């Protein structure tokens, strides 16, 4: 059985694949539809995913400045660089993840001014689930704009072992 830290690393490999698919989905929107408010909403939703990942890394002490939680007006061309920088920082953090870090409690100041305390495991679980939620929204927006929505469910990424030959 793999450790919980190993599972978080594996799940982040999956999330990185989903990030690439999300960028491809956004790029698939026809040029004539990119001026639509829904397109900017989809791009900004992806920027929010990046910002959320950075915000949690900041709260954990591994990102210098807290990002704006809901970026507006992000350019599609800016997303690949934002994603790459964020992924590199998360890979570096997760490479050092162990049971002691997962159990560590940390405190942070929320945007509403309240302070919270949580264990790292809970924060990583929230961050992972948060991405699933918004990727579904991005896929719906892309499909509505005439782009190619991609199913980013985990089952399509993991390596299943077929037991029977296809009929």
Question: What do these predicted regions represent?
Answer:
Residues 1-6:
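Extreme N-terminus of proteins, especially the signal/transit-peptide cleavage junction
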